[in-house]
Amino acid sequence: MTGRRQNSIGDRVLMALVFLFLYAPIIILIVFSFNAGTSSSVWKGFSLKWYESLLSNRLIMNSVYTTLMVSLLSTIAAAIAGTFAAIGLYAMSRRRRTIVNSVNNIPMMNADIVTGVSLCLLFVVFFNGWGAFAGWVNSWQSAVVLPERLTMGFGTLLIAHVCFNIPYVILSVGPKLRQMDRNLIDAAQDLGCTWMQAFWRVVIPEIKPGIVSGALTAFTMSVDDFIISYFTAGTSASTLAMTIYGMTKKRVSPEINAISTLLFVTVLVLLAIINLRDSHAARREHHAAAAAASGAPMKHHRRPNKVLRRVAAGVMACVLTALLVVTGRSVQSERVVNVCSWGEYIDEELITQFEEETGIRVNYQTAESNEALYSLIKMGGADFDVIVPSDYMLARLIQEDMLAELDYSHIPNFQLIDDTYKNLSYDPENKYTVPYAWGTLGIIYNTTMVSGPITSWDAMFDPQYAGQVLMINNSRDALAAALLDLGYSINTTDESQLEEAFALLKNAKDSGVYQAFVMDEVFQKMEGGNAAIAMYYAGDYLTMLENNEDLAFVIPEEGSNWFVDAMCVLKDTQHMAEAEEWINFIASTSSNLANMDYIWYASPNREALEQYPAYYQEVNEEELDPEIFQIMAPPAETLDRCEIYENLPKETLKLYDRLWTRLGV
């Protein structure tokens, strides 16, 4: 008996540990959604401000609206198409049905990235073919002018979702059709029903559970999808999953915790309603069986499951209506500009202000990296007007004739840009770009975890800090640290110097110096005191400093990289006037002041840079620490020790790729 009791206790403990492992991340997420601070690892007190901020976040609300519209429309279309397809399969011979069902299962088993890329390529090929066809038609007639340029957007996103949802409906409806007695249809027709009447009154009621199940699966898959949406949404549409992904480029925003909590609670409530309904149904069946066994007359109880269904339907309808009202906006606009930049790299109030002042709608999306942005544009999977790449990528885009020349008479605020940031190597004649922000790359370290102030890149390769160093997960920056430590230029094309830098980096990795190669993860690790040293950007250090005052930043004595991110317009834009109007607005002094206070990166606008300390004091009601301002905007003598990345020759870029692959990150 004692052994059984011990086994029972052990089973319960094991089950408790399993559930704790499963739900601990969700519990932490919910707790930190009420954190007054911005960190996901440092508690700053209880607050509801992130839920309030969530409702006023236009990017999230617009993406919720898009997600709901795409999911609902694709579910309806997939449910109709999938149901008729399943009925068609039902009429086939067993052998043919088996073959077609196997083909139907391929999209569900196929990797999402394969589906996403293939659909993207299909749309690109079709649009290119359409452009040639429309141009030919327009060349010999003018009665009906066909648009020669089609781009990906809400339409392609909807088509993609319908395509991958249909197989789930077929999979759910098919078994219900096979369970149905074929004689029911014949009997209905013998009693005078037409085929259509038999279809609606006999077939549909029989397969209704399968249709509902397939539709729910389709809706769930559509809401949850990221990869396929990423490749087919273009620039004018962004789902919630895409927006959340974009928001994590810099850190896990507390707003993400808030919306994730709301999603979890919504699912939990729906599951509770479903379980209560099933519980009531089981109780009724039990009472019916007991009454039948005893021969007693059955009592007619009120059907609580029907009431619950009505309540659940009413609640869902109210929630859906509220979301559509809150998030809804007109998707039609005479003027629009499509912008792509980095995550958390703009004060969102500026977007709202620009739209109100100009009437131009802004489609704002984010990219993961310069390389990812380049690939997306090159593949034809994006229709951006304004992009904000870094210096070396700007040089590459200009070299490949992918940018449009700007008419600076339409951008008068360009005169406010300091001469320091004009005529740089990536755009020596100032034809294509307007600087957006600039900053430096350096070393962030925890003063309580190192032996003394860090002054050299040696610290990134020092065995005494084994397991406590975070190396940036970027081949150009990581190799730059090694090149600088060896006394070489970060723009060297000498293969022997790059091999030497690689050897230094590889030796440090193999000897356990690096805890990890990171990008966004650096925030949580450095703020939480989980690492001593990291290579990262000055502006992001200032963000981390708000949550961990033990952190310090240094530009090593050997020098570093100072970078400029600039606004430019793609050559094939259809909204040149709107793009230049957006660039001029962002280049203004007021916009630069607001942006500096939000992103902690220095402005190239000389007036904004001079006025920022006073602006900071006015907005935050405290003086700006001169040391912080010097980190944000280093003086000329510091920048003289730094270099701007140049666009390297193709052979050198290929060497970088080979070395990074050999490093095995």
Where are these regions (language model features)?
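Short membrane-interfacial helix/loop motifs at transmembrane-helix boundaries
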Residues: 3, 24-58, 230-235, 283
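C-terminal transmembrane helix and the adjacent membrane-cytosol boundary/short C-terminal tail
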Residues: 4-13, 93, 174-185, 189, ...
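Transmembrane alpha-helices
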Residues: 14, 19-26, 110, 163-174, ...
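Membrane-interfacial helix termini and adjacent extracytoplasmic/periplasmic loops
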Residues: 39, 48, 113-162, 196, ...
